[in-house]
A protein has these predicted regions:
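Secretory-pathway/membrane protein signature
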Residues: 1-255
Length: 255
């Protein structure tokens, strides 16, 4: 299995996509070729406009998949690249997994002329064709690297913010800020000092990501490879997601 494509809860509105970030670039490229049935522009252009309106840079994100849906065993257990796609935002919800989740309800309230169902089929179909017919699988790890780099930046910021918050909390106790500002007519429990947040050395992660960036950039030259080399590369690309899993299972949730 090369990849798993999941969709559910489709309706009118804007394209939504998430999944393995190795597939992010390919999915975004596909949305350039499909027209939004209500606006007459590409699905990508309309989604970019929404991102700008919401304060973004016009390049909407590709969310990471959680669990609780059909794609869960593929991406988290089998280590198969997976994506979840659909349209929404301009139709009411609340009927999902209820007795009202019917064809009649969908036809009346969700997508009356089935236009977005057709648009979704065009996107999913193009994704399947790209995966099936490309000489080299359309897996691109630049977005994956950028995403993981972002996670590391967030963790760095989190530890710094936590450390500063604890230092301020303890300083307030030393200066009796909490007791001096408490209402004497109300119950008051004096806060206790918190343990200092230690500094964490993330240098090994930074170095690993720097080395990975070199490899990711080198994959950009894959079109110059021989057919035999492409076959070898395809096998590695197809199993790349597996490397990100643990054979024993998730933390405190073994297989």
């Amino acid at each position: 299995t090369v990849a798993y494509i999941n969709t559910e809860g489709d309706g009118r509105g804007f394209f939504e996509a998430g999944g393995s970030h190795s597939l992010e670039s390919m999915v975004k490229e596909v949305t350039i070729d499909v027209i939004d049935p209500q606006k007459g522009v590409s699905v990508a252009e309309r989604l970019g406009a929404l991102d700008l309106l919401n304060g973004g840079d016009g390049n909407p994100g590709f969310y990471a998949l959680g669990s609780g849906s059909d794609y869960t065993p593929f991406i988290q257990h089998a280590g198969i690249a997976a994506i979840n796609i659909g349209f929404g935002g301009e139709n009411q919800g609340g009927e999902y997994h209820t007795i009202y989740d019917t064809y009649g309800h969908y036809k009346r309230f969700k997508d009356p002329d089935m236009a977005y169902g057709i648009a979704l089929a065009k996107i999913a179909g193009r994704i399947v064709l790209r995966l099936a017919n490309s000489e080299v699988l359309p897996f691109e790890f630049g977005a994956w690297h950028t995403t993981v780099q972002g996670y590391l930046t967030e963790i760095n910021a989190l530890t710094t913010n936590m450390r500063e918050a604890v230092e301020q909390h303890n300083a307030f106790i030393d200066k009796k800020v909490f007791s001096l500002t408490a209402d004497p007519k109300k119950p008051f429990n004096q806060p206790i000092k918190k343990a200092i947040i230690p500094y964490v050395d993330f240098s090994s992660l930074h170095n690993a990501l720097a080395g990975l960036k070199v490899t990711v950039d080198a994959l950009g030259e894959k079109s110059l490879l021989s057919l035999t080399s492409k076959d070898v590369l395809n096998d590695k690309l197809m199993h790349a997601e597996k490397v990100l899993t643990f054979a024993s299972g998730l933390s405190r949730r073994s297989w």
